[in-house]
């Protein structure tokens, strides 16, 4: 079960500068007996329309510059921090716990940065480009253990994955009359 709180706030100034922020806090039952009882993930975005601030030539009629940062989280699988035994319907009884006892687990996190712009020019062309970087850590894995350990697997949190990239699109919108 997950209980959550969410907010969103958007502010604009003179139709040219905008700030958006969001936040969510989750209290997930998967976090029982873990050092972190809830997790908060915020975001903030800023955009500016220089084409509304300055007088641009008619052939270059729109420009938006944007930046954002966000942090998101996922809880780990259920019942990992509670010493419970799974119920097996096929035998109408409780199975032995097969995973090695766990220490401290934390929610998986991804933090993302993005910078970009959107433009319209020459009566129908559009150009959008973005650079992004996403860092993910506290990933939960369960590698197999040797049968001699008495357990089949162990849950560990490890790794740091970084994704970086550039996205761009060029378009043309023309209406035949």
Language model regions located:
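Extracellular/periplasmic, surface-exposed regions of secreted and cell-surface proteins
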Residues: 1-177
């Amino acid at each position: 079960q997950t209980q959550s709180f969410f907010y969103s706030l958007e502010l604009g100034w003179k139709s040219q500068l905008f700030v958006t922020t969001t936040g969510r806090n989750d209290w997930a039952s998967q976090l029982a007996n873990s050092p972190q009882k809830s997790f908060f993930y915020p975001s903030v975005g800023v955009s500016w329309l220089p084409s509304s601030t300055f007088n641009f030539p008619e052939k270059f009629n729109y420009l938006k510059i944007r930046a954002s940062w966000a942090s998101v989280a996922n809880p780990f699988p259920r019942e990992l921090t509670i010493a419970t035994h799974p119920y097996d319907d096929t035998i109408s009884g409780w199975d032995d716990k097969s995973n090695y006892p766990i220490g401290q687990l934390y929610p998986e996190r991804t933090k993302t940065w993005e910078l970009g712009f959107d433009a319209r020019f020459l009566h129908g062309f559009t150009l959008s480009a973005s650079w992004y970087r996403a860092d993910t850590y506290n990933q939960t894995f369960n590698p197999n253990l040797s049968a001699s350990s008495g357990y089949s697997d162990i849950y560990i949190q490890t790794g740091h994955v970084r994704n970086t990239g550039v996205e761009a699109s060029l378009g043309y919108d023309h209406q035949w009359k």
